[in-house]
């Protein structure tokens, strides 16, 4: 069964690389929004370290597009896509944040705890976050990118054998091209389809005030 799934995934990648698909994406024009905070990238490193040390991603909703006193204004979705260091998407999810909200996520236990390819999870990889406004958070859909979110991540460094230290950096803004805007949610849908339960990262306990937005 796993062999069949891998074969299907290979066919899906081939389809994504086909001229027809590329032409369809190119026709979409530039990305919806290119300001800071729309599309952000960072890395995780030494996940499987001997000390068992974890890494953390913190996402802040700046509240720039809504009044936090209103129950429906200012909400935003953090579409999160995690890759290993061979460029394969392994997990994805979309987490709701209210205005001025702080979402804290564990790399080991939430962002890379249910990889498509199973365990062991990769030690190093890339985390991509797209700020998206919609009425229901879903990483398989990316329709209204905006610059609501700020993100920071800690990293486990190993300067010498047996010694681990923690550093922290802000996520780096990237350019959300129309190709990337189309690729990320489509690849996520393949990950969820092929994973049959695997490939979904975890946003943590649900906040009752986020019920109308939910997480996926």
Give a label for each model feature:
Residues 8-19:
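Bacterial N-terminal signal peptides
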Residues 21-216:
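Gly/Pro-rich, tryptophan- and cysteine-flecked surface segments typical
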Residues 1-6:
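Positively charged n-region of N-terminal signal peptides that target proteins for export
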């Amino acid at each position: 069964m796993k062999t069949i799934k891998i074969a299907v995934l290979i066919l899906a990648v081939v389809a994504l690389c086909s001229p027809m698909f590329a032409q369809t994406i190119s026709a979409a024009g530039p990305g919806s929004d290119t300001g800071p905070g729309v599309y952000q990238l960072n890395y995780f490193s030494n996940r499987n370290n001997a000390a068992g040390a974890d890494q953390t991603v913190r996402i802040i909703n700046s509240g720039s597009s809504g009044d936090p006193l209103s129950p429906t204004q200012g909400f935003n979705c953090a579409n999160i896509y995690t890759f290993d260091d061979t460029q394969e998407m392994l997990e994805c999810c979309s987490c709701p944040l209210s205005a001025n909200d702080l979402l804290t996520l564990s790399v080991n236990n939430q962002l890379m705890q249910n990889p498509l390819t199973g365990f062991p999870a990769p030690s190093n990889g890339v985390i991509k976050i797209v700020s998206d406004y919609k009425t229901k958070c879903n990483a398989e859909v990316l329709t209204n990118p905006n610059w609501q979110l700020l993100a920071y991540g800690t990293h486990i460094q190993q300067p010498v054998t047996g010694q681990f230290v923690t550093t922290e950096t802000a996520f780096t803004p990237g350019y959300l091209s129309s190709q990337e805007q189309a690729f990320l949610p489509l690849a996520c849908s393949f990950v969820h389809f092929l994973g049959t339960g695997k490939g979904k990262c975890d946003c943590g306990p649900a906040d009752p005030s986020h019920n109308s937005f939910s997480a996926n």
